[in-house]
Curated annotation (Swiss-Prot):
InterPro entries: PsdUridine_synth_cat_dom_sf (IPR020103), PsdUridine_synth_RsuA/RluA (IPR006145), PsdUridine_synth_RsuA/RluB/E/F (IPR000748), PsdUridine_synth_RsuA/RluB_CS (IPR018496), RsuA_PseudoU_synthase (IPR050343), S4_RNA-bd (IPR002942), S4_RNA-bd_sf (IPR036986)
The keyword rRNA processing is assigned to this record: yes
Catalytic activity entry: uridine(2605) in 23S rRNA = pseudouridine(2605) in 23S rRNA
Protein name stated in the entry: Ribosomal large subunit pseudouridine synthase B
Organism from which the protein derives: Escherichia coli O157:H7
Location of the region described as Disordered in the Swiss-Prot/TrEMBL record: 256-290
Length: 290
């Protein structure tokens, strides 16, 4: 069955659907030797040859690919880009290496924001989770500096005008602090550039700390250190897929990796046991010879 080229490439982890549409429009993709056009359809067969910038890439049928999702604790100071000309650290630097696919960030966090950032190997999943029409909730813990009164909170809930259109917090809840340094938990259902900061600035309040603590129903994992990542299990992955109307997965890499770690641990234990037996035998032999 044929599928849109950008969908096949997104599913294979070569970028979000929006990114892939851009590289197709730029003439950087060829199918069986012909420059591809936006809207082209392909059927994934063993003989299919797709190239990006002249490099042959790997694509597989939907049923052959396992969708993987990581939860990453982004520290402040890291950029949401694959490569930085100035050599600054990026969110991709610490992620596990992949063969035949790549990690795609589900949205962005600005350099001064820390917290939960999801990554997936499925570009279609990333695209749908980011799209405003899906209205997936993002929750942030915000420390603000300035006087916050009921009128400002009312404006933030009802909506204020930003340079790229009206915006509002879906929910806003006081969560601690005293005087002019206070913490709030806020939620949005879209991911415009610096939207949380710009909303507060629109009512004359500065954000001094910003942490994303939840995406949909996936929280920032407890105990995860900054710069650390953990892979979501099958139930969590399928929650995200069903949230954006994608078919559920039937298997997960998480179980496979756990089995591999268990086998490795067993191998180490057996090796240690053999070493102990050999060493013990040598010691015993040494005493008998004496």
């Amino acid at each position: 069955m044929s599928e849109k080229l950008q969908k096949v490439l997104a599913r294979a982890g070569h970028g979000s659907r929006r990114e892939i549409e851009s590289i197709i429009e730029a003439g950087r993709v060829s199918v069986d030797g012909k420059i591809a056009k936006l809207g082209d359809r392909v059927e994934v067969t063993p003989g299919l040859k797709i190239r990006i910038d002249g490099h042959l890439i790997s694509v597989r049928e939907s049923a052959e690919q396992i969708c993987r999702v990581l939860a990453y604790y982004k520290p402040e100071g890291e950029l949401c880009t694959r490569n930085d000309p100035e050599g600054r650290p990026t969110v991709f630097d610490r992620l596990p290496k992949l063969r035949g696919a790549r990690w795609i960030a589900v949205g962005r966090l600005d350099v001064n924001t820390c917290g939960l950032l999801l990554f997936t190997t499925d570009g279609e999943l990333a695209n749908r989770l980011m799209h405003p029409s899906r209205e997936v909730e993002r929750e942030y813990a915000v420390r603000v500096f300035g006087q916050v009164d009921d009128a400002k909170l009312r404006d933030l809930s009802r909506g204020v005008q930003l340079e790229d259109g009206p915006a509002a917090f879906k929910t806003i809840k006081f969560s601690g602090g005293e005087g002019i340094n206070q913490w709030y938990n806020v939620t949005l259902t879209e991911g415009r550039n610096r939207e949380v900061r710009r909303l507060w600035e629109a009512v004359g309040v500065q954000v001094s700390r910003l942490i994303r603590v939840r995406y949909g129903d996936i929280p920032l994992p407890k105990g995860l250190p900054r710069g650390g990542w953990t892979e979501l299990d099958l139930a969590q992955t399928n929650y995200l897929r069903e949230l954006v109307e994608l078919p559920p997965e039937t298997s997960s890499k998480v179980a496979v990796e756990k089995d591999r770690r268990r086998m490795k641990a067993n191998q180490i234990r057996r090796a240690v046991k053999r070493h102990s037996q050999v060493s013990g035998g040598r010691r015993s032999g040494g005493r008998n010879n004496g």
